[in-house]
Amino acid sequence: MRSNILDYLNSQTFTNFSTSSELPWDASGVPLYLKNMKKMYVDRPQTVQEPLIDTLDDNGIVNETISVTVYVSADAKTLPTDYETMLSTVKAARLQDLTTGWRQRATSVATSFEGDILVTEFTFNFTKLI
């Protein structure tokens, strides 16, 4: 799923933002997106399986959710002119053909501040029955 989102982001044209294929942290755990503002980083997918219907023969129905997080930062005092466009474009990644076959595709966006840096975090949740 990470590669699907990376492919989508790489296919988009942004004026002030770019995409990195690196993971969001360096070897010591320092967030790269704080060092390299206006560069999007896609984290590894996280998978959760929740049983919906358990059966005695272990052939139940399970809800599998894969979550992928994208991080990007910018100077909070002077946001790039295409910041809002970037938000809309990244959120639309869940709707692309790259993510077909999923029963539910959701995106949440959260922002936080690290000093004068605005950190935007997109969390994509893709859910299917298995």
Where are these regions (language model features)?
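Acidic-leaning, charged glycine-interspersed low-complexity segments
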Residues: 16, 38, 44, 85-130
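Well-ordered, non-transmembrane segments within structured domains
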Residues: 69, 74, 78, 86, ...
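Oligomerization/assembly interface segments of phage tail-like spikes and tubes
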Residues: 58-76, 117-128
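Small/polar-rich, solvent-exposed N-terminal microdomains that initiate assembly or binding
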Residues: 1-56, 78-88, 114
